[in-house]
């Protein structure tokens, strides 16, 4: 099946659907497995000359269906799987280690290829120990208070630039040097994948143990639930952040349209949890319990905020994290102002008496 054939008679749509169906119905498949299936069912050419192009096609379709990466075209040879990197993409080093992987891995399971690019599907840092309220490690949990960890403070205190992306792997990717935070702009996709067990689950690892942990199916589900919950933490549970959202949101170049679920997560004070597949809002979150997969990323920005201090009067007025400091400042300001006014009145009355005398 050549390029011209793909554009005729809905051939591409059939191939697109065939890939989604095959990877959903089979575990630990490779790109070569998918190519073999397409050659049998979609009458794709079975020659060595077309194998490289067919591998790249399958790699691209998997990226589009999972939204974990954007495939790059015509940037290197056909012996390399390449992902697209935007000109303004912040390379924090937490997600992508490289944007190219050899096609020699085409006969390996998807999760092996994905791990070659970096940490696109994160897994919990300590998967052998499940966090619970009775855990002895509870004292070391990092707390996340929506009043202290939110988009409003990120912008006003750290002057962070929020970058809306259509790459799920980049969600909560924070570059400290450029102070750029990437947020996934399509939360509805996470809901759809959780309900349909879609293509993203084909990247699940089947290895029981590994020195380099890779996400299994349950951890992929947890990852997407945490993506949804993170919008509540950063926006929905903090009044100034809810008001800030419509001013800072910008649709991505490819989508050009706002995800309908995004303003619901970011601008509603309360959400009926039965409608969405994630836990209820909490007054305080703990990274180990509520964000076991994304804990490293979310702790990074929370610690940045915790260590930051207002550097101007304007920032001081907006920073209410330290309630004692905030109200002490206002009380001192009020009493100081009253003292200045009384002193000024005393001078005025003294001047009046002097004139009258």
Which residues fall in each region the model found?
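Non-transmembrane
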Residues: 1-327
